[in-house]
Amino acid sequence: MRDFVLGPIFLAIAAYGLAHPWVGIMGWTWLSIMNPHAYSWRLSSMPVAAAIAGATLLGLFLTPDRREFFVTRETVVLMLFMLWMCITLPFSYDFDHSYPLWNRVMKIDLMVLVAMCVLYSKKHIIMLAWVLAGSIGFFGVKGGLFTLATGGSYRVWGPANSYIEGNNEMALALIMIIPIIGFLRFTTNSIWTKRGLVVAMLLCAAAAIGSQSRGALLAIGAMTTVLWWRSDKKFFLAILLVVVGIALLSFMPESWWERMGTIGTYKEDTSAGGRINAWWMAWNLAKANFFGGGFAVAKAELFAMYAPDPTQVLAAHSIYFMVLGEHGFVGLFLFLMLWFFVWGSAARLRVQGKKLPQTLWLSYLGAMCQVSLAGYAVGGAFLSLSYYDLPYNILILVVLGCRWLDGKEWVTEEAEHAKQQAAIEAKSALKERSLRPYAKP
């Protein structure tokens, strides 16, 4: 049954993406973030994402419905980072395992660049935010209800065979999407939609807490701190956050509190000790190898050479040490520079967007993207999500928002809207005149 529902949807997206590549980008984002085809039977083993990506790339050259590629500091650094990963690939310690991972990352980054060519309007930006919110929010609403129904006794897991399959990764994705849902709440005028989005945000928070991820708890703390600091109503927001926090935490069982309590005693925790050991391995590996070790460095041989404790072979579990171990200090420098620039551009949107009523929505976009990135920066310090799609889609939102602001696109869009309205009114008037001879006296 799922195949019969999802199959026509995928075909329609691919077909429509040929004429309108922006539709293909929305479909690709939906597939890469939510992984819906994994819930079907036969479609789960078919290259659905590749088909939609191929149709989108072909449509990019066939249709004028696009903008010329524009150069920003973010796009330049992203392409340099991609180039550096291509340079480090031949020097990988385990090329056979590194190549599939490199191929996956290149596809994601390529579609990020394509998205910045075919998405340009306010409608595109808001629609992309809706796709992201719906894709992750689906798991948040479902997981939040599950957490409340079970009293937090069980962990919330992500979709299988995806970047966010684990409970920790799922929690970070949920935390990062909450500010994006908050931005969408500002863009809608429907009171019921606003209320529904508030409920979705609360359920996403419940699901993130229910994942029993210690990194997620730290990320929530970082996000709420940024949100509170930026608020004009700090006292009211502080009370609201405390009330909501107490309400959500009251559902958590004793096992949750015991696990969160290990944050302060990380030296006694074997899991934390294994991660620190992996971080030292990545540091020593990068010092000894200028190009890093490639995409697959969680190897016993490498830990034997570079780790303080060679018996604990674990992935880096940190976006920073992951890049450091895989691509060396140059790769880490480019990675940090990329997100530093994205943060700065989001700050510019937040400040400059307040100057005009037409750009006020961009101020909220920049502010919420910064809150989301704060969660990624803190929560990602304990997770291997350096190449996960969601933060790169936030990059797209920020870059497109800056382009819309700098190009004063609201002038063009308002003129286009007025032109369309005039055409509709003229068509209605013409139809009315054509019916007059047949009107009854």
Question: Where are the regions that the model predicts?
Answer:
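Alpha-helical transmembrane segments of multi-pass inner-membrane proteins
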Residues: 8-17, 55-57, 82-90, 107-111, ...
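Hydrophobic transmembrane alpha-helices and their immediate junctions
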Residues: 327-372, 393, 398, 403
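Long extracytoplasmic/lumenal interhelical loops at the membrane interface
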Residues: 153, 157, 161, 264-327, ...
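Membrane-interface catalytic loops of GT-C/OST-like multi-pass glycosylation enzymes that act
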Residues: 96, 167, 212-215, 314-318, ...
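Transmembrane signal-anchor hairpin modules in multi-pass inner-membrane enzymes, especially those
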Residues: 1-87, 93-96, 100, 122-130, ...
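Short aromatic-rich membrane-water interface segments that cap or initiate transmembrane helices
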Residues: 37-41, 158-170, 270-274
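Membrane-interface micro-motifs in multi-pass membrane enzymes
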Residues: 1-3, 43-50, 101, 162-175, ...
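Juxtamembrane membrane-interface segments at transmembrane alpha-helix termini
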Residues: 37-45, 88-91, 112-119, 140-148, ...
